[in-house]
Each structure stands twice: as C-alpha cells, then as structure tokens.
C-alpha cells in the first residue's frame, strides 16, 4: 500500500518547500525513510473522508491526498485516558505522515494532519516541541497564552513555542491543517487546564 503514501509525501514536500515560513521553521527533511506501521481506525477518519466543508483555494491537492490516505492511517488517540470526553476522542482527527506510527521516519521533523469538524473545541494543551500549523482548508480560531485570538483560514500559519499553552476552536467551518514539530519529540502533548468539554 505504498501508492497513497508516496503521493501524500510528495505533495506535502511540494507544499512545504514552497512555503518560506515552514522552511525557515523546519526545513523539509532529506533523511526520510519508509517504515512499517499498523493502521488504526477511529470515527474521525470517517468524518474527514465525508467532510464537505474543507474549502481551500491553494491546497486542494494536499487536502485530497490526506483524505485518500486516511483509510490506511494510524489515527492517534493522544488524550485517551485523560479527562477528555468521548466526543473529542471520536471527532478529533490526527494521523502522522512522518514520525512514530507513520509511513515515514525522520530524525529532524514530525508531521501530521489535524482535522476538526465544525463547532469543535480543542482544549488548552502544551508540549516541549515547537510547533507550526499550516491551515490547508476551512478555518478555526487559534488561541495562545497571553496573545490575542486569531481566526485563520486556508494558507494561515500559526507557531507555538516550547511549552506555550494553546487551544483551537471551530465554529461554522471545519478545519484541516498540516502540522510540524521540531525539537523535543519525546514528550506528548498534555492538557494545560481542566477545561475539556
């Protein structure tokens, strides 16, 4: 099942290399290796595959490549076993392209897709890794501690520094984002406050 992954990797590479902010933050890796992993399905995979609100002007190819590969992905459940409820676990979508439980590995980067349906809240959380979001389709409000809220749509960029608490929320539109990490890959995100709902 190489074909959807190879197409997705090449499409992500093209988008990443063309975006100076992404390249400055974390250059697209040159040490990529294939790796074996087991697919793992969650309901968010079906939601993303059937989503009709992921509108984009510039990133349709990458959006579609993430959707095409999603039936074969290992969907993450980062917050399982926390105070996060079933709604979040069933509707928040994230799977890896580069990193653990992903089709490719690199020593310098982690890369995922994140999907959230409309009217969805991703609670405040933080992690040692530095992070950058590129909004591919739809829109969301991004919040960072001690910063004004920012509503971003397709093409918008958001950077989170190490251990900076941040959250996201969608309203009338869903969102899909290409997300990369640099440095400090070993620690998973943790909830900052007990505000999950």
Predicted regions and their residues:
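A short, N-terminal "cap"/entry segment at the start of jelly-roll beta-barrel domains
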Residues: 2-107
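Double-stranded beta-helix
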Residues: 5-9, 171-197
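A generic structural signal for short beta-strands and their flanking turns/coil linkers
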Residues: 91-93, 110-112, 131
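Short beta-turn/strand-loop junction motif enriched in small, turn-promoting residues
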Residues: 100-102, 120-121, 164-166
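Short histidine-centered beta-strand/loop micro-motifs
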Residues: 105-106, 122-127, 144, 169
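Short, conserved beta-strand element in jelly-roll/cupin
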Residues: 113-119, 126-142
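Short acidic-glycine-tyrosine-enriched beta hairpin
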Residues: 146-165
């Amino acid at each position: 099942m190489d074909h959807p992954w190879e197409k997705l990797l090449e499409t992500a590479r093209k988008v990443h290399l063309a975006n100076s902010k992404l390249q400055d933050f974390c250059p697209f890796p040159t040490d990529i290796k294939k790796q074996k992993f087991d697919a793992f399905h969650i309901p968010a995979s079906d939601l993303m595959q059937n989503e009709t609100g992921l509108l984009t002007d510039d990133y349709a190819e990458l959006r579609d490549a993430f959707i095409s590969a999603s039936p074969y992905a290992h969907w993450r459940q980062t917050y399982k076993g926390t105070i996060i409820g079933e709604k979040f676990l069933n509707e928040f979508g994230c799977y890896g392209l580069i990193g653990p439980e992903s089709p490719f590995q690199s020593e310098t980067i982690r890369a995922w897709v994140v999907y959230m349906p409309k009217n969805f809240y991703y609670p405040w959380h933080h992690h040692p890794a530095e992070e950058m979001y590129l909004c591919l389709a739809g829109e969301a409000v991004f919040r960072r501690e001690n910063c004004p809220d920012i509503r971003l749509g397709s093409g918008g960029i958001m950077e989170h520094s190490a251990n900076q608490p941040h959250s996201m929320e969608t309203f009338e539109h869903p969102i899909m984002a290409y997300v990369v990490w640099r440095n400090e890959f070993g620690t998973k995100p943790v909830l900052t406050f007990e505000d999950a709902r």
